[in-house]
């Protein structure tokens, strides 16, 4: 079950490195991200959405229902929790400038480096096992992922305010 964001590749490796560090907080996360960046590599992924099949080299593939990671990085500007689709963000290549742009601006992604697809169902396969995380929890290495949106799966109950009739 994923409510927010899941991914394979670079960020999942950052989550693993962060879990392994004794240091917590943003400095610990920055250290893990730097270590992962220095050891980054690409993976060959094939993914199939409702409408197309794509094979590509990728640094990371994100399955996103929400818009941003807990660190504030807005990886999915198009995300809406209630639109009955999720976005697949294919990060083909990372550069320091693209990471800074994503983190500190609202400028659009460079389409040569990052593409976004909308879908209700997705299957991903990789040639080699890759790091995988779901909602900030490291799940290990995988070579296959299947995902689908489940409409209205979660009901949120909030208390009535003093101004609302009961």
Q: At which residue positions do the language-model features occur?
A:
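Long C-terminal subdomains/extensions of small-metabolite kinases
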Residues: 1-166
